[in-house]
């Protein structure tokens, strides 16, 4: 079991590392490539677009051909793309590399969740996903620090050399440590069961909506945080970085506490708590009259996401013993596209940063509480495949 956890954690961590590692070098990258920082800032969106593209096919391929080949392919693609970024001589080539890098990270991300679905029951999976969420929260804090230390001695290309090393490590884990977890029953004889695992069943759709709205909340918070903290509250860059590090610390603390809470409380209780914290955050931010109250509202967002997201993801994957890859892909695509759609729509409507955040907090909490109260899992809604194949 340990091998699956190590490999899954490594596969997932390529995704945030690919986002956060290079940010500290952005000014120097822009100068060397004769591009503006504004032009290169779309590298974030390009990376997510690459991930979404990979998710369109990675899940289905993983269900048909196995988790291990897709994990290896994703790591190799990530390595090649990182090398392309390090050799880029203009902005267009750099953005192309970032898109391909997103494809590699997307393949690995989908496979990681499929592996956890294959090897863990619902309660253990919820605990592991909560821990994984906490570890993921560490990356946005540590990756820029590591990037800064690297750039004290080396050029910006070394940031992508570091990503190449990470990709090689994941590839080696996938080749030599990871064992195939795709259910051995995935064959023509299992076609009726595969067809029965419909992506249109109401329980899956409810958890799809909950996870998508929750990701929309946290990404809206991240997207609006510079405006909220630096423009509206007057923080300088140092104070902004410190505040974001503290919120990440809260996320980590809650994520690491959630597995213990699952031993005491029902998953539904934690998900309702999550949405209650979102609702409270929306109310606090809408009524806030001081910086301290606003900061308290922001901490509620981080705590709410951390206590409920892993549990909701676990339940979403629960009904799929033979189509875990496809289900993981659908969840990933919905979360990336749904959150991007909300941020774009709110900007088009003309919401300011604070109202954009308050709107998604209150809307998310009300919809999700309704879904949690009305749609619950069946008594025996999942089948676990403990065996693995070399």
Swiss-Prot record:
Molecular function (GO) terms for this protein are: transmembrane transporter activity
Q: Which Pfam families match?
A: MFS_1
| Assigned GO CC terms | plasma membrane
* Localization in the cell: Cell inner membrane
Bilayer topology term: Multi-pass membrane protein
Write the record's keywords in alphabetical order, separated by commas.
Cell inner membrane, Cell membrane, Membrane, Transmembrane, Transmembrane helix, Transport
Q: Which CDD domains match?
A: MFS_MdfA_MDR_like
Task: Give disulfide pairs as residue numbers.
Answer: none
Question: Per the UniProt record, which residue ranges are transmembrane?
Answer: 4-24, 42-62, 69-89, 93-113, 131-151, 158-178, 199-221, 245-265, 269-289, 293-313, 316-336, 353-375
Presence of the UniProt keyword tRNA processing in the record: no
Keyword set includes Magnesium: no
Q: SUPFAM superfamilies attached here? A: MFS general substrate transporter (SSF103473)
In terms of domain of life, where is this protein from? Bacteria
Where this protein primarily resides, as one coarse class? membrane
**What family name appears in the similarity comment?**
Belongs to the major facilitator superfamily. DHA1 family. MdtL (TC 2.A.1.2.22) subfamily.
Name by which UniProt lists this protein: Multidrug resistance protein MdtL
